[in-house]
Structures are given as structure tokens and as C-alpha cells.
Design a protein with these regions (language model features):
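NAD(P)+-binding Rossmann beta1-loop-alpha1 motif at the extreme N-terminus of oxidoreductases
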Residues: 1-61
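Conserved active-site and cofactor/substrate-binding residues in soluble primary-metabolism enzymes
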Residues: 7, 11, 15, 35, ...
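Rossmann-like NAD(P)(H) cofactor-binding subdomain of soluble oxidoreductases
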Residues: 53-55, 60-141, 160
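Rossmann-fold dinucleotide-binding core
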Residues: 106-201
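Catalytic phosphate-donor-binding core of small-molecule kinases
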Residues: 140-149, 153-164, 168, 205, ...
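Active-site-proximal catalytic alpha-helix in oxidoreductases
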Residues: 142-147, 176-221, 232-249
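NAD(P)-dependent Rossmann-like dehydrogenase/reductase catalytic/cofactor-binding core
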Residues: 192-193, 221-231, 235-322
């Protein structure tokens, strides 16, 4: 029997676990928190205030115990922690174990995460799963569509693991474009939240989303991905969801900045992603004004309206420059 391990006991990890349960397979959750592991083992796996959610997942805190015998490992922890699990995966799993990245962002030097894993693990069975998906809706079995990028074996494995009449899985061979699109949607969501918080109107939000998509496409192509990926589930799909809803942490953070409101959740991936994206863009001589705007948004005493005006006062140009 195949053993599925999900690294990360947060909302997204448990949401993916709930989808695996639909296939009559019990996934194992690896978490660093003994309390969280205990909660999951006692059916309290949901991070949401919903007593109807009872997931029969198994969890533990010892990498060796959880990872040994795994045929699939899904990384669903914060992107900053993903690379810290490379050694454990290498030590306690078969060298051909499939590894799926469900976290969104860049490495600490702007690297593309799945490419780092391929190199460090000496394993070609690396994939990325992405797309428009709030964890709560996946857990509640609301219709959702995701894309998995990888080789044919990864696509088949992931489809067998997750695909149902509530969770559709589409395949892609573009690991680079899928990974970058997932990181960039958080960047554009922050910008969209700021525009919304400044009451600049729906026209402006539509413009931010569309031009943010153009910036993403530029970066994807520049780093070796496929232009078309940006117009799929990992790109426009996820970007639209995250840029138009207060359920998105990154959108909510941008909105809170604009309104000068306190923000409790410190997991805002888009700020770091913006800085890593600009690092890559500068190497490639790419223009990414919205992304660059997001890099400075957390500076003290910054007037966001003035920064938006700077973007609007840029010289006119063609919509698409190849």
C-alpha cells in the first residue's frame, strides 16, 4: 500500500489530507508541534471554527517515524521551511519517492524551489501542485481545480491520489512556470489589497490584476517557463482568487496596510516573494513596477498613495512586449 506523508499540519496540509481521505487512504501529517499532532490525532485537525469538520488523519513529530516507507511526500509548510526538510526526506525515504511541493514562493536567493529539490535529492520525481484553492473550501468539498506540474509519472500519481468529482486535477509539464506563478500571485494580491484599501476603485483593481499577470508572464519566460502557464490555474486562476478576496492573507495584509489597521497573521508570503522576484528581474533586465512597489510597502512612514501615483505616472508603452 502506498504511504502518503504531508509535511505541515496547518490548514493547507490538512485540506490536502482531507482530499487524500476521499480515496480511502489515510495520510500521515508531520508537524513540529506536539500539541498540533495530538489535536490532529484526536480529530481536531481543522484550523477553522467549524464543528462539522472531523478528519481522521494521523500525525506525529518525528521525521523518521512518519517518513519511513513513504511513496509520496507533500510539502505543505511555509515556503521558508521547505528546504529545511531536504535532509529528512533524503535520510528516511526511498530515493525515488515522489515529492510534491504545495508551498508557494522562492528560495532565499530567488531560486525556484522544485529545481533546488531536484538537485539536492538527485530525484526527478519532483512536482508542484498549485491553483486557486482556499483550504476551507477544499475541506468542505466545494468544487476546486488544481494543476500538478511534473513528469508523466508525477502527473499520474497525483491524479490518482487527489482527483475526484469535487477536486479536479489537471496536468502540466511546466514546473518552472507553475512554481513562479504560485509565488507571484501572492505579490499581486498584496498590491490588489492596497488598491482596495485606498478606495481607488474596481477599474484600478482590474488593472493591477491584469498588469500583474503581464509581469508574471515576463518573469516566467525569462526564467525558462512557459508563457501559457500564466494563463492557467496556477497563474490567472490563483491570482484572481487571491487578489479579490479578504480570505487571502496577502490581500488582507495589503488592505490592512492601506487602512493602517493591525494585522495578526504574520504569514504573508508575498512580501518576501516580491523581493526575490525583483532580484531575478534585475538579472534578466525585466521591468516589474507592481512587484517593485510591493517590495517597499512595509516601510515605516511610507505614503502608499504617493507610491501608487509613481506607478501611474510612468511613461506610456505597448501592452505586450516580447
Amino acid at each position: 500500500m502506498n504511504k502518503t506523508v504531508i509535511i505541515g499540519g496547518g490548514a493547507w496540509g490538512c485540506a490536502l489530507g482531507s482530499a487524500v481521505l476521499e480515496k480511502k487512504t489515510t495520510p500521515f501529517i508531520l508537524t513540529s508541534s506536539p500539541k498540533r499532532a495530538n489535536d490532529i490525532n484526536n480529530g481536531k485537525s481543522s484550523r477553522f471554527d467549524d464543528n462539522d469538520i472531523q478528519l481522521k488523519l494521523k500525525a506525529g513529530t518525528k521525521p523518521k517515524d512518519i517518513l519511513e516507507g513513504a511513496s509520496v511526500v507533500i510539502l505543505a509548510t511555509e515556503v521558508d521551511r521547505v528546504l529545511s526538510f531536504i535532509k529528512a526526506i533524503k535520510d528516511f525515504t526511498n530515493k525515488n519517492c515522489a515529492v510534491l511541493i504545495a508551498s508557494k514562493g522562492f528560495g532565499n536567493k530567488g531560486e525556484i524551489i522544485p529545481l533546488i529539490l531536484k538537485e539536492k535529492l538527485k530525484n526527478d520525481n519532483i512536482g508542484v501542485i498549485s491553483g486557486p484553492s482556499f483550504a476551507y473550501e477544499v475541506i468542505k468539498k466545494k468544487p476546486t481545480a488544481l494543476v500538478v506540474a511534473g513528469n508523466k509519472d508525477i502527473i499520474k500519481l497525483t491524479t490518482d491520489l487527489f482527483h475526484s468529482n469535487k477536486l479536479r486535477i489537471y496536468g502540466s509539464e511546466d514546473i518552472i512556470g507553475t512554481s513562479i506563478s504560485g509565488a507571484m500571485k501572492n505579490v499581486i494580491a498584496i498590491a490588489s489589497g492596497i488598491v482596495y484599501g485606498l478606495n481607488l476603485g474596481e477599474n484600478a483593481r482590474a488593472a493591477i490584476l491584469t498588469r500583474g499577470l503581464a509581469e508574471t508572464a515576463r518573469l516566467v519566460e525569462g526564467l525558462g517557463g512557459n508563457f501559457e502557464t500564466v494563463f492557467g490555474l496556477a497563474g490567472i486562476g490563483d491570482m484572481a482568487l487571491s487578489s479579490l478576496s479578504m480570505t487571502s492573507r496577502n490581500f488582507a495584509w495589503g488592505y490592512s496596510l492601506a487602512k493602517k489597521l493591525p494585522f495578526k497573521n504574520n504569514l504573508v508570503e508575498g512580501l518576501k516573494a516580491s523581493k526575490m522576484a525583483i532580484k531575478n528581474a534585475e538579472k534578466l533586465n525585466l521591468e516589474m513596477p507592481i512587484t517593485r512597489f510591493v517590495t517597499v510597502t512595509n516601510q515605516d512612514n511610507l505614503d502608499l498613495k504617493i507610491e501608487v501615483e509613481k506607478m501611474l505616472n510612468r511613461p506610456p508603452k505597448l501592452e505586450w512586449i516580447k
